[in-house]
C-alpha cells in the first residue's frame, strides 16, 4: 500500500452537482436558479440581516450593556484546582505557574467547588464564604 494507491471506499463520495450543462441534465440553462431576480444573478443575494429595506430587527431594538474590561483579567478558581498547585502558600503567581489561571489574569477568586484535603495558606486572593470555611476546616488560613 502506498499513498498514491489510497482511495475512498466505494459509494463514500458523491459527485458534485454539475449545473448549466444542457437540457438533458435537468439543470441546464438557468442552472436551478429560476428566471431573473436578484438571486439568479452572479454575486446575487442579500446580506445577513437584510429585510428588504424594512428597518431590520437589530436596528429596531435598543442597545444595551457593555463588556467589562475587569472581567477579562479576573478568574474564578475552584477549591479542587488548588490541589494542582505545589507548595503550601498559594498566591496569584503560583496559580499562573501551575497553569490554573492564564498569564493575563490579575485578580482571582476562590470558589467553593470540589474539596480541599491539605492545609494551604492563600495570600492576596479573594475567597467566598463557603470556600473560606472549607479551607479553614482543612487547617488552612487566608492572608489578605
From Swiss-Prot:
GO terms for cellular component: cytosolic large ribosomal subunit. The keyword RNA-binding applies. NCBIfam families: rplO_bact. Keywords: Ribonucleoprotein, Ribosomal protein, RNA-binding, rRNA-binding. It holds the Pfam family Ribosomal_L27A. Part of the 50S ribosomal subunit. Belongs to the universal ribosomal protein uL15 family. It comes from Yersinia enterocolitica serotype O:8 / biotype 1B (strain NCTC 13174 / 8081). GO terms for molecular function: rRNA binding; structural constituent of ribosome. Residues 21-31 have a biased composition (Gly residues). Gene3D superfamilies: 3.100.10.10. This is Large ribosomal subunit protein uL15. The keyword Membrane does not apply. One of its GO terms (biological process) is translation. InterPro entries: Ribosomal_uL15 (IPR030878), Ribosomal_uL15/eL18 (IPR021131), Ribosomal_uL15/eL18_sf (IPR036227), Ribosomal_uL15_bac-type (IPR005749), Ribosomal_uL15_CS (IPR001196). Binds to the 23S rRNA. Residues 1-52 are annotated as: Disordered.
